[in-house]
């Protein structure tokens, strides 16, 4: 679709109050899903982050990388095992996870931001003890009894020390964070990227937390894209979970939004990362995209 000059002008005018409103504000973006695989979507996300930075916003990117980790493990002859959606991570697997997330994906994102006119610095939770972590244990039921399963080097966020992020932003760079935490003995932990993004947003007291997903948002009817719930009050969440409207992998994402709101983040969004420039559409247009989770 080709826009006329008048239509392009209208888009810029619509964005103007939002550019003014969010000048100097922090937006934490969880980058994952199809947007990390498709070349055009990769380009769009990088361009979105660069534009936000150039108009005075403070974007912070937290990225995942599950598919690339699984691919690398397969190439090295290691099978991936998951329990409750968490990758069982022994010491050797943790080395591979860290190599892929920190050494490969993180640096590719940094390079692409520079390619499209921005400046970025790649970090992980071990840098400046940004993300202090503790071991996570899976609680399961077997034969009617509750059991704890050791997931290896899978972690939970214990504490976020955002000083290094603030320093990077103050120097004019976009921080790009890999979701690796550091334990009390200096050991590495693999942490869910949504959780890292949420806790980082709280520590930075971000104005927005934006989670990119592979769905339109939260749908009242999962078979009907037109049933998108554009704004969801936290008080409705238990009922929607009970009804099965919020289910599967969407539950931890919604819980992440709730935790962020409780911690002082002003707005949280679950948006469709398969739409080019969905971040800009959410931030700079009247209608936005996806589902906004709000207090209430």
Curated annotation (Swiss-Prot):
Protein's job: Catalyzes the ATP-dependent phosphorylation of N-acetyl-L-glutamate.
UniProt record, GO biological process: arginine biosynthetic process via ornithine; L-arginine biosynthetic process
Family from the record: Belongs to the acetylglutamate kinase family. ArgB subfamily.
GO cellular component, one term: cytoplasm
Pathway terms, separated by semicolons: Amino-acid biosynthesis; L-arginine biosynthesis; N(2)-acetyl-L-ornithine from L-glutamate: step 2/4
InterPro entries in alphabetical order: AceGlu_kinase-like_sf, AcgluKinase_fam, ArgB, Asp/Glu/Uridylate_kinase, Glu/AcGlu_kinase, NAGK-C
Site (Transition state stabilizer): residue numbering on this chain: 30, 253
Signal peptide (UniProt feature, chain positions): none
Gene3D superfamilies per UniProt: Acetylglutamate kinase-like
Main location, first listed in the record: cytoplasm
Gene: argB
Top-rank taxon, per record: Bacteria
Pfam families: AA_kinase (PF00696)
EC number of the protein: 2.7.2.8
Binding of substrate, residues: 65-66, 87, 190
UniProt enzyme class: transferase
Reactions catalysed: N-acetyl-L-glutamate + ATP = N-acetyl-L-glutamyl 5-phosphate + ADP
Keywords: Amino-acid biosynthesis, Arginine biosynthesis, ATP-binding, Cytoplasm, Kinase, Nucleotide-binding, Transferase
Name of the protein this chain belongs to: Acetylglutamate kinase
Intracellular or extracellular location(s): Cytoplasm
Molecular function GO terms recorded: acetylglutamate kinase activity; ATP binding
């Amino acid at each position: 679709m080709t826009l006329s000059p008048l239509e392009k002008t209208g888009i810029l005018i619509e964005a103007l109050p939002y550019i003014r409103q969010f000048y100097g504000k922090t937006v934490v973006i969880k980058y994952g899903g199809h947007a990390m695989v498709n070349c055009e979507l990769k380009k769009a996300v990088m361009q979105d982050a660069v534009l936000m930075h150039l108009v005075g916003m403070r974007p912070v990117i937290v990225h995942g990388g599950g598919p690339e980790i699984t691919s690398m493990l397969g190439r090295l002859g290691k099978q991936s095992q998951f329990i409750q959606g968490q990758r069982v991570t022994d010491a050797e697997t943790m080395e591979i996870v860290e190599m892929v997330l920190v050494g490969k994906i993180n640096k590719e994102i940094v390079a692409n931001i520079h390619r499209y006119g921005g400046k970025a610095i790649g970090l992980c939770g071990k840098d400046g003890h940004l993300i202090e972590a503790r071991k996570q244990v899976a609680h399961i039921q077997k034969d009617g009894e509750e059991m704890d399963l050791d997931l290896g080097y899978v972690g939970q966020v214990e504490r976020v020390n955002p000083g290094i992020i603030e320093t990077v932003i103050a120097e004019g760079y976009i921080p790009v964070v890999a979701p690796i935490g550091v334990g009390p003995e200096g050991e590495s932990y693999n942490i869910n990227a949504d959780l890292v993004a949420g806790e980082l947003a709280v520590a930075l007291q971000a104005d927005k937390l934006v989670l990119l997903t592979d769905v339109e948002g939260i749908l009242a009817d999962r078979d009907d894209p037109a049933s998108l719930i554009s704004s969801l009050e936290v008080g409705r969440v238990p009922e929607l979970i009970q009804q099965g409207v919020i289910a599967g992998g969407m539950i931890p994402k919604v819980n992440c939004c709730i935790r962020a709101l409780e911690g002082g983040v002003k707005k949280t969004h679950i948006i469709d990362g398969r739409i080019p420039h969905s971040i800009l559409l959410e931030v700079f247009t009247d209608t936005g995209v996806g589902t906004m989770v709000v207090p209430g």
